[in-house]
């Protein structure tokens, strides 16, 4: 059997044909910093950095500023001549505009003779009857007549103006019979007063009619404005609340413009309060003290009654009661009544603070004292009234006798490092004499003498150092007061 082979060629159905991308222009090859400007055709730099290439057909602009004398740094094409002048695109455009303006100034409008020569072909001339000179003079005359202006007339003086009554044209024929004094040249005092009174009454009625007309126009425009505003609110009210999401750029711009128009010349915050106070002051100044009660609306007055008389104080914002009667409002949570004391209750409204039971300044409870002062140790009476025999003077402490060795162990060190002898109140003199006798009988006289000499020298120096500050303490008779050495 013969086999038939069928080759199925692949089709392009369902395949996306790749669209060849347009090759993007190469960017500038400026080395100092990256530049995204496209290159010039056939060059490696953009128009801004083309001067970096010395072989490029460009040079620096020849424009020099008249203010600072600096030359333009932009690039300009090289001229054909070597010493030619070339400008960049901006200065070339400015130069062309300046030349165009100068040509307009130097070239005035068409002259009259030029126009006559152009219009001479349209003039009707008889054959052989007129010469070119006569036709030109005729055309000049026609042109002069056509160019006649009001400036050639003489100015009108005051005497030449019309002195008629403005209402005379509106009067009817019958009015001449009703007003016999209309054309009279001389009037009496009564006639003048009567005429002026009638004119003032007429003027008053005209002013009243004019004000009524203006009021009608104002109401009509306000009605149209409110109607248009209602239509805009119905059409754009939802979009104003939801925000500009989902709107086009043009719709967003129109929405922003509409919001700006709504906020135009509207007062907010402190400015609105000051404007209301200014209006109230103006009303008081114009209407007098009789209108003072009407400046505050009934809705802004407190609703509380005191002895069957309504409170005249102004209510707090967003409430119907004043500060004194705000506790009568059961829905408010910002104020509470002061509890006061058990003897004298107090119902003064107090703002709710961090504490659960707020109080007014008169019944405010002070917190417990956080700081407790340290207790001062009292000095015993026996030390204060001690006998004077226990105090040693400076003469008694002179190094005339040897001190016992036991005193050296009891030496104290003060702040400056100098040792001082112990207080005489800390030991018994009888015990000291017994210890001294026992030490002498020991037989070690040499060591005891050396120790006694060192102790005497140290004790004398410390006693002298402690005695000098005591010189400043004096009694009333000028003698120093004996003090104890601590």
UniProtKB/Swiss-Prot annotation:
Main location: nucleus
Protein origin, superkingdom: Eukaryota
Any Pfam family: zf-C3Hc3H
Annotated crosslink Glycyl lysine isopeptide (Lys-Gly) (interchain with G-Cter in SUMO2) location: 78
Residues that bear Phosphothreonine: 131
Cell compartment(s), UniProt: Nucleus; Mitochondrion
Compositionally biased region (Basic and acidic residues): 135-144
GO cellular-component term (any): mitochondrion
Transmembrane feature ranges: none
Protein name: KAT8 regulatory NSL complex subunit 2
